[in-house]
């Protein structure tokens, strides 16, 4: 089969590989669509920032159809349409704690979804309804990351939420805040095209940080600051601005990868504001199922986040390199079988 294999910094190769032998608790998935995640891009550019095994088939945001099941598989059957829950938790029922402990993942420690077929443990599989298109189902994973962060922040009806960064994770955070009932959703980015998408997703206010000081503008609108802020950009400036945008005793959530150390005046900015900083990784089974249901019922306009669809042969040039060089790109999907 054709597969994209990660060898190290800026070294992803499209190769022919044998499909691995199916074990009793495994399922064989014919991959339909796979998304390029920000963490995939970090592995491509900054290998030390992402724990991965070399010579792995990468990709953890994907969907497809089961074509074979192992002898001990009881929940799934041939023909089931599925998406992937890539965190390989030892005890998925304890995801609230274990998602911060277990870092093994599909596409990093076992072969992932940038391939024609994937052999996966049955615990990493979620069945999807027939009315959920497979290309949309490939985005369940990033949507769940953002929705879980909004849950962890305990966003409630009437809250004011600021999101720094309008890439896919930031845009899904906007949707999560909207579903949670936030009254005001402010998005900050450097590109008008991304801010336009944020408005389409439900942002009530947007600011281009190249044109205005976002903290000043947010404080003009909401003098006390935001109830919560979400840092989804992954740079030093937005980290500090997110803290400064948050109200006294509010919470700032970090869901971005920071590949470099940052500087911030922690004692002063935190002691004298009472702002809490927290992080979130992964998701619970409950959140995953909620996102699947919302996407299937049309409650999330996820199609708008897709900016390109490419073939696996062009993964590096039209995928990874495009995300680096064309900042108008948001979510790039890779077509494998292309099934609907």
Where are these regions (language model features)?
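Short Gly/Pro-enriched turn/cap motifs at secondary-structure boundaries
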Residues: 7, 19, 53-60, 106-110, ...
């Amino acid at each position: 089969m054709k597969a994209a294999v990660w060898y190290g910094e800026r070294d992803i190769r499209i190769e022919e590989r044998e499909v691995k032998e199916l074990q009793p608790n495994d399922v064989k998935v014919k991959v339909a669509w796979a998304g390029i995640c920000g963490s995939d891009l970090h592995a491509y550019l900054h290998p030390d920032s992402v724990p991965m095994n070399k010579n792995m088939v990468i990709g953890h945001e994907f969907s497809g159809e089961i074509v074979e099941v192992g002898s001990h598989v009881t929940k799934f059957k041939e023909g089931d349409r599925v998406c992937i829950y890539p965190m390989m938790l030892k005890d998925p029922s304890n995801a609230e704690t274990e998602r911060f402990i277990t870092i093994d993942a599909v596409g990093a420690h076992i072969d992932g979804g940038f391939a024609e077929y994937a052999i996966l443990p049955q615990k990493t599989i979620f069945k999807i309804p027939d009315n959920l298109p497979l290309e949309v189902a490939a985005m369940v994973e990033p949507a769940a990351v953002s929705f879980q962060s909004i849950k962890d922040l305990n966003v409630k009806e009437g809250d004011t939420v600021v999101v720094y960064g309008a890439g896919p994770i930031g845009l899904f955070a906007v949707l999560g805040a909207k579903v949670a009932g936030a009254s005001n959703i402010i998005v900050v980015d450097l590109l008008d095209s991304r801010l336009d998408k944020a408005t389409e997703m439900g942002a009530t206010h947007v600011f281009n940080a190249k044109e205005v000081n976002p903290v000043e503008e947010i404080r003009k609108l909401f003098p006390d600051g935001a109830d919560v802020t979400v840092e989804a950009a992954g740079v030093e400036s937005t980290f500090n601005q997110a803290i400064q945008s948050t109200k006294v005793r509010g919470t700032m959530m970090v869901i971005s990868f920071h590949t470099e150390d940052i500087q911030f005046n922690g004692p002063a900015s935190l002691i004298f504001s009472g702002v809490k900083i927290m992080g979130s990784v992964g998701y619970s089974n409950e959140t995953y199922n909620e996102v699947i249901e919302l996407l299937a019922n049309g409650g999330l306009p996820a199609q708008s986040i897709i900016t390109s669809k490419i073939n696996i042969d062009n993964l590096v040039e039209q995928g990874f390199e495009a995300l680096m060089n064309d900042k108008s790109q948001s979510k790039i999907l890779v077509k494998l079988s292309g099934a609907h």
